[in-house]
Amino acid sequence: MSNDTLHKYEALPEDHRNVALRPCLIEEFVGQTEVIKNLKVFIQSAYERREPMDHVLLYGPPGLGKTTLAHIIAKELKVNFRSTAGPLLSKAGDLAAILTNLQPMDVLFIDEIHRLNRNIEEVLYSAMEDYCLDIVVGEGCGARTLKIDIPAFTLIGATTRFGLISNPLRDRFGIPLHLEFYSVDELVLVIKRAAGVICTSIDDSGAREIASRSRGTPRIALRLFRRVRDFLEFERKHGTIDGNFANSALFRLGIDGAGFDKMDLKYLKFVFEAKGPVGIDTIASALSEDVGNIEETIEPYLIKTCFIQRTPRGRVLTQKGFEYLLSSKYI
């Protein structure tokens, strides 16, 4: 594999349209206050010592800024940024090719690091700790191990499934950072910053209307903002996005007052109709969705906002969830 795996992933950022809206510097990053405070210390210390920063593990629900933070760390350290993804690394040789092509102090970002297979993880162990690769050459009695030195680097791993990372790999990250859902006020700032970047007028009520339906997630906030902007340009050509206009556009997009879309509501209604604990496999079958997708994208916010509860016997609708479905006339 030369750098094909590396370049293949870099050509597919999580959302091309978000690239221009991403903050480039740590001072521009909105939210995750405690994480940012600590990162400033770690970045500045490593930069002043002219040493690679310790390896970083970013974990939390999708869309909270893990990839953006990885870019920012490299930018602040003034080093090259290289990226790939766990599913793209099928052989130990794929990872070895990337590591041997790094420059000193580079940042290597591995998205979905929980999807690395164990053989590749073992290659990472010596690379992370000793900046070397142990390569087995030959087979059987003639097999021998070659030790290849690689440049000192910083590995940044990102995952939405922290529990799926093996303990040996997890323990080799000196800086584990958990990203939390955003508050409405923080999402308002994210939306206003994006509006300024793409020269779209939006007032406080419009930004707050979108933010309140974004499930605590910047990626969703930016996606909804772009769609509301589309409606504005289609219907008025110019003007300001206010609360009423944003509400109307979001209604047309099928986003309700709590930020739930049709799939969220289908999930909640199914759990309600089950009249008791229901297993994730049963839910996935009923919704025709992958179990992993439900656990990664649908459930985290529903659990965070106490609409559903996980129990040893399955998922249960909470009183809050029941009252919401009832008051919104979904049941």
UniProtKB/Swiss-Prot annotation:
Chain sites annotated for binding ATP: 21-22, 63, 66-68, 129-131, 172, 182, 219
Keyword tRNA processing: no
Gene Ontology biological process terms in this record: DNA recombination; DNA repair
Documented EC number(s): 3.6.4.-
Residue ranges of the region described as Small ATPAse domain (RuvB-S): 183-254
Catalytic reaction list: ATP + H2O = ADP + phosphate + H(+)
Subunit structure of this chain's protein: Homohexamer. Forms an RuvA(8)-RuvB(12)-Holliday junction (HJ) complex. HJ DNA is sandwiched between 2 RuvA tetramers; dsDNA enters through RuvA and exits via RuvB. An RuvB hexamer assembles on each DNA strand where it exits the tetramer. Each RuvB hexamer is contacted by two RuvA subunits (via domain III) on 2 adjacent RuvB subunits; this complex drives branch migration. In the full resolvosome a probable DNA-RuvA(4)-RuvB(12)-RuvC(2) complex forms which resolves the HJ.
PANTHER family, sorted: HOLLIDAY JUNCTION BRANCH MIGRATION COMPLEX SUBUNIT RUVB, PTHR42848
Written domain comment of the UniProt record: Has 3 domains, the large (RuvB-L) and small ATPase (RuvB-S) domains and the C-terminal head (RuvB-H) domain. The head domain binds DNA, while the ATPase domains jointly bind ATP, ADP or are empty depending on the state of the subunit in the translocation cycle. During a single DNA translocation step the structure of each domain remains the same, but their relative positions change.
Family: Belongs to the RuvB family.
Protein's name in the database: Holliday junction branch migration complex subunit RuvB
